[in-house]
Amino acid sequence: MRLNPIIKKDVKVQARSFKMCVEVFVYELIMALVFFVALLYITSQNRFTDGNVYSQMVWLYPVLAIAQWVILGAVIPIHTSSAISGEKERQTFDIMMTTGMTPWSIIMGKVMTAVAQAMIFVVASIPVMALTFVVGGLSWSYLFWFIAVALLVSLFAASIGIMCSSFCRKSITAVIVSYGIYIIFFVVTALPAYLICILTDYAKSEKDMIGFLLLNPVVYITEFVAKSMTDASWIADIIGQTKSPLLNWLASGSVWMILSTIAFLAVSFLFLLIAKKRISPVSKRKAKKLAGKQMTQITEQSNG
């Protein structure tokens, strides 16, 4: 299987750059600071109690996991927002489109490069994360789920950045638009549910409310932490006792997490398709139509 040339080139350039070393160092430093601050907080809260302080160390896992997901979600759009618009600024976009690569290969190459870079950060943080498993006594399967969610966050953030980069000519504009789309997913997806609860009877509006939250990152991470740490569903607590078979099914087991993951993957794929469509060269049929219009305009001007 032939490796995507963009991935091969960009990963090599990033791996050899001093900037990458600095970014990994800063990332590790932030993770270490978060770990020690959380550790000091947990020990201070249990200093004057009879409980076992080590039983509370398990909460280091969600603290570090959420910190990393937030950093990845904030940093990746900055890198991917210049993937296409940066080529336009350097005036190399047309050269890139004349290569033998398809628009889809170009988009996937840029996205996979961003995901690979994110995984470098995640792998570099494993020693710090390992401390939470050793001290807190967690199963190592939690590490797998942490990496899986990190992959989802990276793909989702990268797809937003790539789509914005394909529409914008300036990288800074693409970054701003990317964070604007973030606000839509964080706030706008929760706002209809909140308004429904206020303006209507909560018991009658559960079905309408719950659908909006499938694409809310805060709800997704909260549900993941609740299932991981307490084996209880936060969504089930929101829904409460209901006679609706659909809502009971959503709140059972890991159904909500699975559906929400599928929804985020589908939206990410949609964003990538939009980006691919945006950078695709004009098709032959459209090119003929444009050529015909241009010839008509030239003829009219010459006759006029």
Positions of the model-derived regions?
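Secretory targeting signals
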Residues: 58, 62, 113-169, 177
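Long, hydrophobic alpha-helical segments
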Residues: 60-86
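Transmembrane helix boundary and interhelical loop/hinge segments in multi-pass membrane proteins
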Residues: 76-97, 110-111
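Junction motif at the cytosolic side of a transmembrane helix
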Residues: 248-304
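Aromatic- and glycine-rich beta-strand/loop motifs that create alpha-glucan
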Residues: 1-25, 284
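Hydrophobic alpha-helical transmembrane segments of multi-pass membrane transport/permease proteins
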Residues: 19-44, 69-72, 178-186, 267-269
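Terminal transmembrane helical anchor/hairpin motif
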Residues: 41-46, 51, 187-270
